Regions:
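Short secondary-structure boundary segments
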Residues: 14-15, 52, 125-127, 145-146
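Short, charged, surface-exposed secondary-structure boundary motifs
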Residues: 110-113, 150-154
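Paired acidic/hydrophobic, glycine-rich loop segments that form the ligand-binding mouth/hinge
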Residues: 6-13, 120-124, 140-142
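Hinge/capping helix and adjacent helix->loop/strand transition within the periplasmic-binding protein
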Residues: 2-9, 15, 22-109, 158-163, ...
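Short helices/loops that flank or line small-molecule/ion binding pockets
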Residues: 1-5, 90, 94, 108-118, ...
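Conserved helix-loop-beta element of the AMP-binding
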Residues: 36, 62, 137-150, 166-167
Length: 169
């Protein structure tokens, strides 16, 4: 934010540093207006996955179990304010369910927590979770995008699986 606006300094950033952090931290070393966006390069889907011990096969069943067991299901995230944390909060709000959020310090720790059953639910990026889905270590329920994911085209979207209007990228 301190470089001259001459086009020689470019920052490749994501929504966490430029929109979410402002709502989490009382002060930031920059203002959003210090930057001029030039392109949106990607929209990364999240895959809604569950530990195999959770007796659900789709989004409708997950919502039903969550409603029958308020504050008993635990979902993990890569940290407070991360995209998968916000995906979980939106899911809770739109489905009118109560689940417990546990933030971890990154993708590795939260993936281990899901694989071990420490958390039952995770919204995960395909790059970190597809191998575990294919290895039958976790169960994929849906993708958070409005269209099917190229990484796993057989998965339905959350919106078409029981939560109309749900979209996170």
């Amino acid at each position: 934010a301190k470089s001259p606006a001459d086009g020689y300094t470019i920052l490749f950033a994501y929504s966490g540093t430029h929109s979410v952090n402002r709502s989490i931290y009382s002060s930031m070393p920059f203002q959003e207006s210090d930057f001029a966006p030039i392109i949106w390069t990607a929209a990364v889907p999240q895959i809604l996955v569950v530990h195999p011990s959770l007796p659900v096969k789709n989004v409708k069943e997950l919502i039903a179990v969550a409603k029958s067991r308020p504050n008993q299901l635990v979902y993990g995230s890569t940290g407070s304010g991360a995209i998968n944390h916000l995906a979980g909060e939106l899911f809770k709000m739109m489905s009118n369910t109560q689940m417990v959020h546990v933030p971890y310090k990154g993708g590795g720790p939260v993936s281990i927590a899901l694989l071990s059953g420490e958390v039952s639910i995770l919204f995960a990026e395909p790059a970190t979770i597809v191998q575990h889905i294919k290895g039958n270590k976790v169960r994929a329920l849906a993708v958070t995008t409005p269209k099917h994911s190229l990484a796993m085209p057989e998965l339905p979207t959350v919106a078409e699986s029981g939560l109309p209007g749900y979209e996170v990228t």
